[in-house]
Amino acid sequence: MKKSKVIALLFVFITLLASCEKNGNILPENSLSVQNVKNSECRPNVKSSDDEETLRLVAKGDVLYIERVGVQNCSFKLEVNVSNEGNTIYVKELNASPIIASCFCCFDFSYEIKGMEPGKYVICVSGRREFKPLAFTYSTTLNKTYELEID
C-alpha cells in the first residue's frame, strides 16, 4: 500500500513537472552588456510620423542585435544603457550630444545586447519617450520587426 502511494505521488510530480511551460533560463541580474552602438546621420528627406517607431530584433548567438528607426533631436548621438532583472530587459536610449537642436528628424540606430540565452523576455525601451513593454521569445531564429507603442 505504501509503495503504491509513493509511486502515485512520484507519477503526479513527474506529470506536473513535464507539463510546466519552459521559459528558458532566468538571467542573473544585470548580466547583459551593450556593444556596437551606432546611429545614422539625420535623414531629413525621410518622412516619418512622430508616432512611427520600430524595433527589429535579430539573434546572433548570445547577442541580441537591435535595429531601430526613430524620431530624435537633429543633433542626436546615441548612447545606450542596458540592465536586466531576470528576463526583463531595460534599455535606456540617451542623447549623448552636447548640442541641443530645436529640430527633429528620422534616424536609424542599432546596438547589440550581449549575454542572451534562449527563453521568453520582456524588453522595456525608453528614451525621448517611454514605450510599452514588448514581450518576445529569444531563439537562434529570431528575426522580427515590432512597432513600438507609446506608453
Per-region residue spans from a language model:
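Surface-exposed coil/turn segments at beta-strand junctions on protein surfaces, enriched
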Residues: 59, 84, 102-106, 116-118, ...
